[in-house]
């Protein structure tokens, strides 16, 4: 008898094989902002708020991310990684997260964990990634 991990692996393999044959993207990454509250030497995404404000390129807005997400979902994207910098520093993180979950994405969050407080835990329990 299969355990849950074996069953999940078989389902994942099936999805990837089927998507690959049809040239459907299953995985995507949204790098919300280069801002991070840590300065890890091994990481290339670690700008301060000041560095971002003096940067000459505008940040992607919530509406722009939502439009990208709608297009990606229409193409078959299923798994979406939210990353940064530190994604919880992005001002509209929770609005975007909520919308992505309701669009049907399976969301993962790449975070250093330093900003996960009781409120974040409550929100993640309400709408699990």
Named regions from a protein language model:
Residues 2-127:
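Conserved alpha-helical substructure of the radical SAM core
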